[in-house]
């Protein structure tokens, strides 16, 4: 990430932000880039975007079919040489990536929640996840030679994330009249998110009572050997765009069937629930 940030601030002058994660993260990154000598611009696509980044920004309120021309005109008018987004599979970001791919003077940068979590952020050029330029050869990672990673002292921001999400979706709904043509990449019903966050909170509290003992057993090798099977959010683009599965349910079914057929009978399958699902 440091390599890409260094390249960004030393080679790009006029930077355009599209959608970021819910909360003030993009605003803070923009302030840091300004201090580094960059000119920063922002296009808001809904009321949530506008709430967290209202100053020095413009709103796009037309249909998505008109976004390519709008974006190309904006890039030309402001001499944009870099676009920064959060996630590269949202429909507006796909359009931006397509424009960047056809323009040798325009670079495309993507933030994503860390491949390693907690306490890490992913930032790559040209794409993340399935579009990442990272090597996909298993041997590359086997030969890196890293035996341990320093433990971060960062604090959990789980409840801040919930607060930002609620604020974001409230303002998305409140300004729906302004951004009536906006197409969101996920379900936008506030009741949908509220009910699922409540269920997730209950599950989280329950896990705090049960999991410590189970984790201790794993650490003490009472379930050895074991294989970790980390789950993804059901609506995540890793599943929707970069996998042959239509849902986590089908993915789990496939892994369990395979494990039962081919794993050693003394092995354990440790399924890790996604913290944001």
State what each model feature region is.
Residues 18-28, 45-141, 277:
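Active-site and donor-binding regions of nucleotide-sugar-utilizing enzymes
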């Amino acid at each position: 990430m440091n390599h890409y940030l260094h390249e960004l601030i030393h080679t790009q002058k006029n930077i355009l932000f599209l959608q970021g994660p819910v909360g003030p993260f993009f605003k803070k990154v923009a302030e840091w880039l300004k201090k580094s000598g960059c000119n920063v611009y922002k296009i808001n696509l809904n009321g949530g975007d506008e709430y967290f980044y209202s100053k020095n920004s413009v709103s796009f309120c037309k249909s998505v079919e008109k976004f390519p021309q709008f974006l190309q005109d904006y890039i030309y008018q402001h001499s944009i040489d870099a676009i920064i987004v959060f996630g590269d599979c949202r429909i507006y970001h796909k359009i931006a990536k397509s424009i960047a791919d056809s323009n040798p003077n325009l670079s495309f940068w993507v933030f994503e929640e860390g491949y390693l979590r907690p306490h890490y952020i992913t930032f790559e050029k040209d794409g993340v996840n399935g579009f990442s330029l990272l090597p996909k050869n298993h041997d590359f990672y086997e030969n890196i030679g890293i035996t341990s990673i320093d433990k971060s002292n960062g604090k959990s921001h789980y409840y801040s994330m919930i607060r930002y999400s609620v604020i974001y979706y409230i303002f998305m709904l409140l300004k729906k009249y302004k951004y009536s043509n906006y197409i969101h990449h996920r379900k936008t019903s506030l009741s949908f998110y509220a009910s699922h966050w409540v269920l997730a909170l209950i599950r989280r509290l329950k896990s705090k009572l049960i999991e410590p003992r189970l984790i201790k057993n794993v650490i003490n090798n009472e379930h050895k050997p074991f294989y970790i099977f980390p789950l993804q959010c059901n609506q995540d683009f890793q599943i929707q765009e970069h996998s042959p599965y239509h849902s986590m349910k089908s993915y789990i079914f496939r892994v369990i069937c395979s494990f039962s057929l081919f794993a050693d009978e003394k092995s354990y399958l440790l399924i890790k629930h996604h913290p944001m699902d």
